[in-house]
Amino acid sequence: MHCQLGGQARALIFLMFESCRNSWHVSPWSSVPFLPSPCLFFSFSALPFLHPLSQLIACRGSSATWLFPVSSGTLVLRYALAASPPRGTMRPSTNPRTAEEGRPWLIHATQTGPQTASVLSLFPAVNAGFFSACRQHRGGRPPCLLNHRRLLLGLVSVLTVFLSCLPFTNATVSPAALQDVCYAFGNISRKLSSFLVPSRVTCPRGATPLSGVEAQDSLEHPEIPDFRFLVYDVKNGEGFHLQKEVIYRVALVISLLNARSAQQGRMTDVHTAEKAREDRGHPQASHMLCASSSFSHACSARSTFPFFPMWVLVLPPWCRLAHWHFSEETITAMAENSWLKHVRWGTFFDFQDLGERLPVMEYEDFLTYQLMRPDPWGERRQRKEKQTTPVELDVVLSVRFSSTPSSRSLPFCACLSSRASEIADEQAQRDDVCCNVNDLPGCPQIHAALTPQERQRAPAQRGGDPREEIDEQTGEFNEGHNPSGDGEREKRKPGRRSDTSRSRKEIQEEAKVSDTWSGVSLWLAGFCETVRALEMWCASLYIADAPRIADLLWRSVAERPPGAIQTVWLKFGENLLVPWPDVLLDAHLLDMLHVHPKLRQIGDLFINKFLSNRDKTETGKGERASTEGGTEGDENLAKHGYIAAHLRRTDFLYLKRSVPLQRAAAYLVSRMKEHGVFKAFICTDGSEDEKRELRDAVRRVGDAASSSPYTVVFFDLPTVRRLMIKTLEASSHVSDDGSFHDLKAVETPGYSGPNHISLLLHPGITALIEVWIAARAAYFIGTKDSRFSQAIRWERHLMGHPLDSSLEVFCVDSSPDQTGGQAQGKCFATKSHDPPEGRSRSELRRKYWPSLDPSSTL
């Protein structure tokens, strides 16, 4: 029943037979978004990121038989044998002879990307026809199923073998056929639609129907919100790798929400079928099962929330990040290349593979979609004042830790939907409220991210903030805490009354100056831009993990009217607890971020040129095998002939957490001698003088220890650029949308387009290439408590390197207590939230090393 097909394949198969033998019926699938009803009963669709069901679910009664064989990461076949549909329900535009002769017919249509695939003729007994559109059946007898078990089981067997061998390729479509398709929201809308089911070929409301299809037979837009978007960010000052780490936490929230949405949708389907059976006088089924990825239970099928949309993760933009220091050359290049100023996620990582794990989109695409898409609920809000910010979201959510007894005892948390005055009265009488709605004084994290204009308006309208005051002479704000809320407050000026001495009743009385809540304007992390939120939720949880955040969002959104909440902004996403690797592995999210292939290509080029111990003749023969095959055991690790280390300087020097360079040189020579290599690749943010000092120290220590020359290698940008210009026969260019395009003859005179050379000017790009080079080393030594070192260890674990080759860190001093453990002169990082050893061989590893034998082990 399962067929593993390509990741981009989106197939939709409908099986219908015109012979009706008895009263077996199929209820319409009307409650699931993007599925036209009632003519589409079961589909063959790609849902690798939902994984809502973990077993075969069979709901069989006297009037319906449903089979749901579901497996995460595979394409699922859902089939139905039905009688001829009522008139007007289904309209095949080709092969009319099939319907006239009463022969069975099979409609097979595929859609890959923005193009509609051509229709295939499968075999003589079953003709293929292009399926145009469906319209909801308003009356008449529903289609029925055949009651032949042998035919049903035989068909399943035939389809299993047939579909496993069927070549699904990207079919081409003629321009005339493409003109017949009405595009609702452009490429972005079709991409979003492909997350759930194959993109619908429909017209937007008020537009011209499909060519050759009458208006009454065209598919109408469902009057439900198709998607909900979750935007997240982190506090200002965090680096690249923390933002990369937070995506795993928020992605798990998205996965849980979509799994719950799919489960509720199927429960509603079962309820619809049971109600139809009761109306026909049939008894209820004795036993039915519903299941999710974590549990199975009897279907109560009495859901009160009628809509089950798809949740989409919106990746935050890369703005001002710590440790990203732009050179003068980079600043000059930014003025000429706009794409270099705001590099997208698709430039750093393989965005196509990421999209196969969960619904995800870039922040820029999200803004475009928000401006283009029509509101299915009409004008939800009548704004009296002109919108002053380019982006407006429905809700901003902030989550913080709370150890109060009420937070520990509450089984769940939900942000209630009420007017601000009612919420204030309720909070004054109750102590177990876990979420404050539109209560700015009670949410210091949100208050710290206010824009200057919003801060001037906040004290007058909502009673000020107890953690901030205004200088009476300069008018500037004296902030008393950082946005994450975990820092110490600054000392307040003498002569001023501390707002903390004011009672909450006084603050609430001043808050009543403003009759209505008009939203709040906040900075997107890194001061990217101003975003306005129409509603504010501030939740206090004892355990802020992904399941509880997903449950909070589900309950809070379901408590409001349909369509009221479509965009949610998770402020300070780093406050979410880090999920265990086993949980991410079971959710197929552990290895969802692949370093972009072009960046890996640059890293492999650097390794083969500067870090390989092979001679020139061997290098010429095995360069391709090394680049594609990677580390195929200890022998290939030795071929690379280098170890790697991360030496963090700058801020760690002031914190006295950086190892002296002379001691670091002794460490490096000792480890190179231990592993039989003579080169060490060093990742560091130190100055050129520090690099020169370390190189000289390694040479001196190496000469004293052995006659072999020990050297260290740095990722020198000018050297790499000269290497690329000299060796790359074809350069890959980066377009404005962040995607790569191969282009010949990059040295063409007069050409000024962006290429790999200009791409290397970005500090984030070079840092990610260094991570890749260090991850492929035979051994790695990191810096304790550094996110950069942790990112390298993460990549190494996923590649299959043993843990003992990645956990060592530089000993800052001789005390083992400050380094997490010391044995035989070595210090080790704390084993915390690392991928489980023994389960590290994942899809990421197979993606990086396609020629690796799955049966081999490191």
Swiss-Prot record:
Topology, Cytoplasmic side: 1-150
Major subcellular site: endoplasmic reticulum
Residues annotated as the enzyme's active site: 238 (proton acceptor)
Residues that span the membrane, as ranges: 151-171
Membrane topology, record value: Single-pass type II membrane protein
Name assigned to this protein: GDP-fucose protein O-fucosyltransferase 2
Pathway noted in the entry: Protein modification; protein glycosylation
Site label Essential for catalytic activity, positions: 795
The keyword Glycosyltransferase is annotated on this UniProt entry: yes
EC number: 2.4.1.221
Residues reported to bind GDP-beta-L-fucose: 237-241, 646-648, 787-788
Gene name per UniProt: POFUT2
GO annotation, cellular component aspect: endoplasmic reticulum; endoplasmic reticulum membrane
Effect of disrupting the coding gene: Loss of MIC2 O-fucosylation. Nuclear O-fucosylation is normal. MIC2 protein levels are decreased by 50 percent. Abnormal MIC2 accumulation in the early/mid-secretory pathway. The number of plaques caused by tachyzoite infection of human foreskin fibroblasts (HFF) is reduced by 40 percent. The number of tachyzoites that are attached to or invaded the host HFFs is reduced. Egress from the HFFs is also partially impaired. However, another study shows that loss of POFUT2 only leads to a small decrease in MIC2 protein levels and has no effect on MIC2 trafficking and interaction with M2AP.
Feature: compositional bias, Basic and acidic residues: 486-510, 831-846
Family according to the record: Belongs to the glycosyltransferase 68 family.
Chain spans, region Disordered: 448-510, 819-858
